[in-house]
Regions:
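Early exported N-terminus immediately downstream of N-terminal targeting peptides
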Residues: 25-76, 80
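A short, surface-exposed interaction/processing loop segment used at functional sites
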Residues: 132-152
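Extended interaction-bearing regions that mediate binding to partners or small molecules
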Residues: 33-35, 61-66, 96-107, 114, ...
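Mid-chain, structured segments of secreted extracytoplasmic proteins
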Residues: 64-108
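Bacterial Sec-dependent N-terminal signal peptides
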Residues: 1-26
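Solvent-exposed interaction surfaces and binding hotspots enriched for charged
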Residues: 34, 41, 80-83, 102, ...
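A short, solvent-exposed beta-edge/loop patch
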Residues: 112-139
């Protein structure tokens, strides 16, 4: 009985987390100057070369459950998107796994582990006139994400 209750609790937490991330992307999906993209596992399997913006993710595409991208080149929206994203990352107990500040670009990679062994990473890249959030869930490692962030 304890196992059933624990399993239900974990499933509920996973659903709430997915809902919070979904809310971020949906909040800005119909906003002028904001581009949102959702790519499912099935779609990634059908595509040969998978790119997230200028990043090649073909090497890990088969291990992903989904890929979400939010990109905004409208400077007036950047503070709001940043604040919303960071609030969600804090509320959902993401940990900062890597930060890079280089030439005016600030990149933070947040991560979380799930009980089923899957990992979720959110890459938040902020430049002077642009913000990009890339959210990935699957059987992936930090090294995979660093390869994407570094453009390898």
């Amino acid at each position: 009985m304890k196992r059933i209750i624990l399993t239900l609790c974990l499933a509920t937490v996973a659903c709430l987390t997915a809902f919070a991330q979904k809310a971020l992307f949906e909040k800005y999906s119909d906003t002028d100057g904001v581009t949102t993209v959702y790519i499912s596992r099935n779609m990634m399997r059908m595509m040969g070369n998978v790119r997230a913006g200028d990043k090649d993710i073909s090497k890990i595409a088969s291990r992903l459950d989904y890929l979400k991208i939010l990109s905004c080149e409208r400077p007036s929206l950047i503070p709001s998107i940043k604040k919303t994203a960071q609030s969600i990352f804090n509320q959902q107990k993401y940990s900062i796994v890597m930060q890079v500040n280089e030439g005016g670009e600030h990149t933070t990679i947040y991560g979380r582990n799930y009980p089923n062994g899957k990992k979720e990473f959110a890459l938040l890249a902020i430049e002077r006139n642009e913000i990009t959030i890339i959210n990935l869930l699957g059987n992936i490692s930090l090294q995979d994400i660093q390869g994407i962030a570094g453009g390898k």
